[in-house]
A protein has these predicted regions:
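N-terminal beta-loop-helix "entrance" segment that forms/cooperates
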Residues: 15-39
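Short, solvent-exposed amphipathic alpha-helices that sit
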Residues: 1-11, 107-122
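N-terminal beta1-alpha1 ligand-phosphate binding loop
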Residues: 1-18, 152, 156
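Generic recognition of short, well-ordered alpha-helical segments
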Residues: 1-4, 29, 57-61, 142
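Hydrophobic/aromatic beta-strand patches that form the interior of the parallel beta-sheet core
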Residues: 16-18, 45, 86-88, 127-130
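Helix-loop-strand module that forms the ligand-binding subsite of alpha/beta enzymes
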Residues: 33-116
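Glycine-rich phosphate/pyrophosphate-binding loop and the adjoining helix
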Residues: 119-185
Length: 185
């Protein structure tokens, strides 16, 4: 599913797809390069599988190295101020497992709290995730194509500034109802 989502946006003009594992197979992250990329974009999306209620390890390494005091946060750190930040994730469990009475005890939103706190510290605008759940049950090819198409539609809407940001604040997932959050031109 993650490959299909990435492929759905790879060819979009005005959108940068940046694969950390491809760029840094040795985990030696070029901090200056990554900071430049962040400065050049208004929307930052972490697209990943939701491993053990978190991001893959390279994303944690990226956060630890790239979001430096004085650049991303602190009294002088304003490089990310006002930028939009969210996760596009896939998870094995379905929506019923990500509830207080479910197998995972917490909602996806609650499990993403450390990233929301990071966004807040960096003065970024946090948005709910684009979430594809139930991956462990297997997804039919048609459903994979549908989710990938929705992801492309949403990323395109962000690029074209067609997202109604007021309407997304209270939604659990950006893709809960794309028709309600994408303004018609």
């Amino acid at each position: 599913m993650n490959r299909a989502m990435k492929a759905a946006v790879d060819d979009l003009d005005g959108v940068t797809v940046h694969d950390l594992y491809r760029c840094y197979p040795d985990f030696y992250i070029d901090v200056a390069r990554e900071q430049r990329l962040c400065e050049e974009h208004d929307v930052i999306i972490f697209q990943h599988p939701f491993y053990w209620y978190s991001t893959p390890s390279i994303m944690k390494e990226w956060l630890d190295l790239v979001l430096q005091h004085g650049w991303a946060y602190g009294s002088e750190g304003r490089a990310l101020e006002g930028k939009y930040y969210f996760h596009a994730l896939t998870a094995g469990g379905d929506d019923s497992t990500y509830r207080h009475q479910g197998a995972n005890l917490f909602t996806i939103s609650e499990l993403l709290s450390p990233y929301r706190a990071t966004a807040n510290l960096c003065r970024m605008r946090w948005l709910p995730p684009f979430a594809v759940l139930g991956i462990h049950q297997g997804l039919a090819d048609e459903l994979i194509r549908s989710h990938a198409s929705d992801y492309r539609l949403m990323v395109t809407a962000f690029r074209d500034e067609m997202i109604d940001l007021e309407s997304v604040i209270d939604t659990p997932y950006l893709n809960s109802n794309l028709a309600d959050i994408i303004r018609q031109s």
